[in-house]
């Protein structure tokens, strides 16, 4: 592959038409070094200004050498260079999350509107095969995208249509860990695909074609249903079950961090098909709100006091949570306060999926309790949960206290006192 071939493709796709400040993710391997040299050579022709971002994972003896080389190269070529060092227990996922968080922060702080990575066609084939192996649903078989939203801008992969063997063998650092079998992707790259390619030399090409066709299928479906207000319950339920299935899949693409499993997806679909009212936690700080007319998935904002985090109340101390002041003292006055153990801290938090409270000889899920008490759906997320030793002691909601039942008062040596700051 000549760089001129890539240049022609990049210009045809207009990858950088709306971008000037470009951040390049460079590991030091042959792929990213080719990307760096390509964009460095053609930055004037592409009318862009480039910078380099590198993460030192500290996993190999030559990691520091790579960082120093890239730093010096960037300095000699008058290119901004940003680096970060991964700390903590290493895993592929943790390292990836660290890298992309670092890239997002650099983009935001220094005004870069595009992150460029060196993923190529072999990476695409490996990704599709990996997802097939893991039993991923159809929409995940669309594979890696050439362009996607990322941070405050876009993530662009200009090499994605080109194979690794087409890249020039320029100076680079070899990563010995890519040859090991510790990671599934390495086993796919080094063993599974080579063996299967002996049966069909065009296997990688077919995997990529399947990914492209799957992507076209979803695009066609989106185009055909784009005029539907799918959050309108009447419109959603008027569709066939097959269309409902893919409408919901398309809707969930708006929430990439939600990551629902197949079982969770099926349950979500069942709720939309059968429930008139629903308001409950899904996962990863997302909630589903539904009434007879509309539904929506919403994310809890970190700035919202209503959803403040967990607090620990130690014996002999006091904390503020929401509109209440909680104090944990010795049970000297048996007529006041709520009896609790004095040898376990008290946890004050918001509701979690599956929460239960003991009511005598049985336990009841909070969701069922709220239904039985006819508490409106929109109020249920206001509940404050107080627990001790993994048991819910009480629930505070809308000025009403729901106490557990069936515990032995005589073994409770402490008292929990609650004061409403608004009274």
Swiss-Prot record:
It comes from the Bacteria. One of its GO terms (biological process) is tRNA modification. Its main location: cytoplasm. It catalyses: cytidine(34) in tRNA(Ile2) + L-lysine + ATP = lysidine(34) in tRNA(Ile2) + AMP + diphosphate + H(+). Its EC number is 6.3.4.19. Keywords: ATP-binding, Cytoplasm, Ligase, Nucleotide-binding, tRNA processing. CDD domains: TilS_N. Gene3D superfamilies: HUPs. Ligates lysine onto the cytidine present at position 34 of the AUA codon-specific tRNA(Ile) that contains the anticodon CAU, in an ATP-dependent manner. Cytidine is converted to lysidine, thus changing the amino acid specificity of the tRNA from methionine to isoleucine. Belongs to the tRNA(Ile)-lysidine synthase family. This is tRNA(Ile)-lysidine synthase.
């Amino acid at each position: 592959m000549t760089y001129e071939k890539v240049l022609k493709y990049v210009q045809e796709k207009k990858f950088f038409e709306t971008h000037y400040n470009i951040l390049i993710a460079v590991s030091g391997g042959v792929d990213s070094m080719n990307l760096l040299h390509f964009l460095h050579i053609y930055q004037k022709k592409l009318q862009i200004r480039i910078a380099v971002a590198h993460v030192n994972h500290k996993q190999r003896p030559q990691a520091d050498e790579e960082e120093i080389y890239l730093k010096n190269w960037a300095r000699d070529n008058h290119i901004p260079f940003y680096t970060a060092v991964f700390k903590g227990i290493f895993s592929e996922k943790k390292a990836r999350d660290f890298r992309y968080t670092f890239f997002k922060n650099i983009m935001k702080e220094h005004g870069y509107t595009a992150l460029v990575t060196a993923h190529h066609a072999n990476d695409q084939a490996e990704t599709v095969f990996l997802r097939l192996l893991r039993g991923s649903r159809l929409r995940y078989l669309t594979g890696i995208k050439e362009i996607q939203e990322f941070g405050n801008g876009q993530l662009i992969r200009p090499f994605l249509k080109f194979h690794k063997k087409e890249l020039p063998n320029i100076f680079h650092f070899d990563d010995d860990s890519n040859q090991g079998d510790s990671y599934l992707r390495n086993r796919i790259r080094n063993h599974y695909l080579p063996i299967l390619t002996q049966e069909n030399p065009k296997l990688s090409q077919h995997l990529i074609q399947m990914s492209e066709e799957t992507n076209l299928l979803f695009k066609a479906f989106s185009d055909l249903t784009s005029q539907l207000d799918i959050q309108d319950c009447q419109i959603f339920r008027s569709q066939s079950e097959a269309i409902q299935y893919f409408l919901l899949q398309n809707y969930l693409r708006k929430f990439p961090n939600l990551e629902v499993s197949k079982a969770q997806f099926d349950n979500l679909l069942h709720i939309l098909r059968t429930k008139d009212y629903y308001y409950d936690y899904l996962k990863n700080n997302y909630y589903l709100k539904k009434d007879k007319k509309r539904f929506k998935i919403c994310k809890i904002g970190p700035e919202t006091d209503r959803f403040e985090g967990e607090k620990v109340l130690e014996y002999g101390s006091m904390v503020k949570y929401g509109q209440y002041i909680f104090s944990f003292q010795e049970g000297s006055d048996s007529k006041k306060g709520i009896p609790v153990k004095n040898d376990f801290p008290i946890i004050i938090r918001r509701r979690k999926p599956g929460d239960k409270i003991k009511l005598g000889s049985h336990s009841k899920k909070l969701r069922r309790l709220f239904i039985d008490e006819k508490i409106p759906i929109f109020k249920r997320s206001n509940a404050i949960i107080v627990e001790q030793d993994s048991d819910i002691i009480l629930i505070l909601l809308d000025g009403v206290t729901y106490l557990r039942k069936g515990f032995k008062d005589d073994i409770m040596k402490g008292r929990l006192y609650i004061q409403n700051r608004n009274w």
